[in-house]
Amino acid sequence: MNTTSNLKIGLALGSGSSRGWAHIGIIRALAEQGIRPDIVCGTSVGALVGAAHVAGNLDRLEEWVRSLTRLETASFFELNSSFTGFVNTSRLRKFLERHVAKADTRIENMAMQYGSVATDLESGREIWFTKGPMLEAVWASISLPGLFPAIRHEGRWLVDGGLVNPVPVSVCRALGADVVIGVNLNGDIVGKHLAKTPKKEKKNGVAEAFSNLVKEYAGPLFSFSEEQDEPPGLFDAIAGSVNIAQERITRSRLAGDPPEILLAPKLSHIGLLELFRAEEAIEEGRKCVQRAMPEIDFLLQKM
């Protein structure tokens, strides 16, 4: 619809880890309705999906996340020798270069405007990336403390932007957006991160043995527990803490700078690191846009 007007449409893709695959469905559904943003800004996983879209790699990213399994997800995590995080950074970099943007991709060379948000670990200030290497902008924005090592940039240690600006409406406006569509992944998550995942298919042989090994050592990463009365594991506790903090910050930021349109996919059943549940998240992203289309149509026609 922005193709028939002079409005600059901004898309603010919020933080939310595994729930962020819903951004793929949202981008697809908006495009099907003729809504193609001029400006894409993202925080954390929103920065990652947004970068893939702006760099022309959304198809490649979607194909990969739809094929991701529980065991492949677990392979991204290991305690590194310096005890700075649990993410295999070498594997993550290869993934980003293959499915998000090439190492030499620069933000200012893209056809769409792009921005990401990170947090200065020392001062607590938000840092915006609107030019320079795209992968650096993504990496800084997704560096969730405790899981990802902080990234050094211009003398600062940077971590996940969701700590300060979970839905970067302000970045879209600063880049010139007349209308901002915000995506909040944190609206219904507090207290629900322990929801069970769909039942797994039965494995046998080596696959089953390996699955059991992963379950033993990486179980707290996902919803392996059969008993909801068990005390939360390490990553359940991290997930709950992150959910509470981001929900409160999101509410505060959106109250002060609301987007013209706010999309809130229903994703409370997907845990912090359940990256293998992409199909559910993408489908809910599509449904979220479909539910909001009467409001979106009305607003854009009025403007």
Model-derived regions: residue spans:
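Patatin-like phospholipase
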Residues: 1-43, 51-303
